[in-house]
């Protein structure tokens, strides 16, 4: 089930970019439906008329709904870090990402994307996870996402540790069959088990392979790096047909050519984007649980996500933001921007 955010959460669209709200309290209006094509779509409020600190702490200050009905896409928080192996704190990621999203606008001048003129978008609050039982949390996540996907709504997820991608992909595969995967991360997350446990943030994609959730010939992992306990830590991945792009193969270069190859590999079938913030160098994203040096840059992250435009993206997540290690808030700010870029890359988003 989905749970609304803290008290004061309302549902319905906020004031449009060109609309001036009444003086005094900021009150979102009634919910709109995508079925009414001539009806105005939800719009984040313009700072020209509504001060950034004003309103409910939702993603981009969008309306908060309890149901995915009528939505083309939605932001969902999964505040879970029970599966972490090093630094905790990712359970606070969704809240902090939402806080930092107030700086985001409604259009993307760099790509020409007009997401809020193309899609009905809202914030669906958080999945009500069980912090004391990881298996039960995964069940709750899967059930919540099955409802979201069944409604025809594309989920954009605020994590949470990387364990959450496993139940999300269970829900995705239930509707779409095995999906392609663009996985941006410092780690492959295909370890079989740790301390006897097969369910944690280092193993989600191993579990996905075990259950046939992935179209393994359409899995690309970018940004992989770090020390290991073996000299060939990527043998399993390559044996499954994954393409593994190491971080050092990305150093000092544009990733636009790489993403051209990725688009050809993915084709027109459904794909899922899973972005671990530790793919980025800790100079840019220190607030994460398992940082690795010599990572990607923010501009490369933009090239990767923008390179997905035109693909059949059925869902996205941004995981592993740990606010206790993000003293400046820059990691969450970066995460919020990357989620906006994912929204802009979704199918049916108009570009000019």
UniProtKB/Swiss-Prot annotation:
The modification N6-succinyllysine is found at residue 217. Mn(2+) 1 binds at residues 162, 185, 189, 276. The modification N6-acetyllysine is found at residues 193, 217. Optimum temperature is 67 degrees Celsius. One of its GO terms (molecular function) is agmatinase activity. Its EC number is 3.5.3.-, 3.5.3.1, 3.5.3.7, 3.5.3.17. Hydrolyzes linear guanidino acids to form urea and the corresponding amines. Displays specificity for substrates having a negatively charged head group and short chains including taurocyamine, guanidino propanoic and butanoic acids. May protect cells by detoxifying potentially harmful amounts of guanidino acids. Metabolizes L-arginine with low efficiency. The gene is AGMAT. Residues 11-49 are annotated as: Disordered. This is Guanidino acid hydrolase, mitochondrial. It is found in: Mitochondrion. It comes from Homo sapiens. Its main location: mitochondrion. One of its GO terms (cellular component) is mitochondrion.
């Amino acid at each position: 089930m989905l749970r609304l955010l803290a008290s004061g959460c309302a549902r319905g669209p906020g004031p449009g970019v060109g609309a001036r709200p009444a003086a005094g309290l900021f009150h979102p209006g009634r919910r709109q439906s995508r079925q009414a094509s001539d009806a105005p779509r939800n719009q984040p409020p313009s700072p020209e008329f509504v001060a950034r600190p004003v309103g409910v702490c939702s993603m981009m200050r969008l309306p908060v709904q309890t149901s995915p009905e009528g939505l083309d896409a939605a932001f969902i928080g999964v505040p879970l870090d029970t599966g972490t192996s090093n630094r905790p704190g990712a359970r606070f990621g969704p809240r902090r990402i939402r806080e930092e999203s107030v700086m985001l606008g409604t259009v993307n001048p760099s790509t020409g994307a007009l997401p809020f003129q193309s899609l009905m978008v809202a914030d669906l609050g958080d999945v009500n996870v069980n912090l004391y039982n990881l298996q039960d949390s995964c069940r709750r996540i899967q059930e919540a996402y099955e409802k979201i996907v069944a409604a025809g709504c594309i989920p954009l997820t605020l994590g949470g540790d990387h364990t959450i991608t496993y139940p999300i992909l269970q829900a995705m595969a239930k509707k779409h069959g095995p999906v392609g995967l663009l996985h941006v991360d410092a780690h492959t997350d295909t370890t079989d088990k740790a301390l006897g446990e097969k369910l944690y943030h280092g193993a989600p994609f191993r579990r996905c392979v075990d259950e046939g959730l992935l179209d393994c010939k359409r899995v690309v992992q970018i940004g992989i790096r770090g020390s290991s306990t073996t000299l060939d830590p990527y043998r399993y991945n390559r044996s499954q047909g994954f393409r593994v792009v190491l971080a050092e193969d990305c150093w000092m270069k544009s990733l636009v050519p790489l993403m051209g190859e990725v688009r050809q590999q993915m084709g027109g079938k459904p794909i899922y984007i899973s972005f671990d913030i530790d793919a980025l160098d800790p100079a840019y994203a220190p607030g994460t649980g398992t940082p690795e040096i010599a990572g990607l840059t923010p501009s490369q992250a933009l090239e990767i996500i923008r390179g997905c435009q035109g693909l059949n993206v059925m869902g996205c997540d941004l995981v592993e933001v740990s606010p206790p290690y993000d003293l400046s808030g820059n990691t969450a700010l970066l995460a919020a921007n990357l989620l906006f870029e994912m929204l802009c890359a979704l199918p049916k988003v108009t570009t000019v």
